[in-house]
Amino acid sequence: MLKYSISLILLSLLGFSAVAQNDSIASDSTRYAQKYGLRLGGDLSKIAKTVIDDDYTGFEINADYRFSKNLFIAGEIGTEEKTTSSTYLNATAKGSYFKGGIDYNMYKNWLNMENMIYAGFRVGASTFSQTINSYTIYTTNQNWPQATITDATKHSGLNAIWAELILGLKAELISNLYMGFNVQLKSRVTEKEPDNFENLFIPGFGRTYDSGRFGIGFGYNISYLVPIYKKNKKTPTEE
C-alpha cells in the first residue's frame, strides 16, 4: 500500500509542477535554457527493505547523463544479499550487479521544466554466490522419512545476464533535486547455476520464479542533478 501512495504523491507533484510552471511563463518567451549534466542518486526502496526485512540487505546507486533533449545515458550499480526458501530448499544469494542503457523522456516540459515520464532499456550483469543452507531429499517411499540436509554449501563464481524494459517518472521537487519511481520488466538471457540446484534469487534481477525467464521489479529513487552546461531551446511565442 505504501508504494502506491508514494506513486500517487509523485504523480501529483509532477502535475503541480507543470501548472505552476505554466503560470510563470511570460507570453513573449521565445527561448529557454535546458540543463545538461550528471544526475546521481540512490534507490530508497532497497534501503527501506534492508531495514524491515531480516532476510534482505541491498544498496543501489543510479546515474544518468543527458545526451540530447530527450535521450539520457543511464545506469545502476549495486549489491544484494537475499535468503530465499522454497519447499525443499533454503539458499542465500550474495553478489553485485551493473546495469547500463538509455532512457527516453516522453514528457513535453513547459520551458525550463526538467521533469520526466520515460521509457528505458537496460542490459544487466551480475556476479554472485549461492550458499545452500539446507535442502530436503524428496522420496516417494512412505517407509522412509524425507531427509533434510543442513550442512551449508557455498557455490561461488555464478553469473547472470538479462535485459530490462523500464517505465518511470522523475519529478523535480526543488531546484536540481528529483524524486521518482520506476517499474522494470526483466528477461534472463544466460545464467550459471549451482550443481543440481536452481538459483532462487539473482542480485540485480530478483526472484527467478521457478525457472521462468521473466521477472519484475520496481524502484523509488531520489537523485540530484549536477549541472555541467546549458543549451538554449527555442519555443514558439504564445499569442
Positions of predicted regions on the chain:
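Glycine- and aromatic-enriched membrane insertion/assembly motifs of diderm outer-membrane
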Residues: V51-M106
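Residues that define the transmembrane beta-barrel architecture of outer-membrane proteins
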Residues: Y36, D55-F59, K94-F98, N115, ...
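Short loop/turn motifs that connect adjacent beta-strands in outer-membrane beta-barrel proteins
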Residues: D23-Y36, N70, K108-M116, L173-M179, ...
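Outer-membrane beta-barrel "beta-signal"
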Residues: K99, D103, G212-E239
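Structural signature of outer-membrane beta-barrel channels/translocons
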Residues: D64-R66, D103-N109, G168-E172, N221-P227
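Transmembrane beta-strands of outer-membrane beta-barrel pores
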Residues: L44-A48, I77-T83, Y104-M106, V123-S129, ...
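Extracellular/periplasm-exposed beta-strand and loop segments of Gram-negative cell-envelope proteins
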Residues: T50, G78, K82-G95, F128-T139, ...
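Transmembrane beta-strands of outer-membrane beta-barrel proteins
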Residues: L38-G42, I73-G75, F98-G100, N115-F121, ...
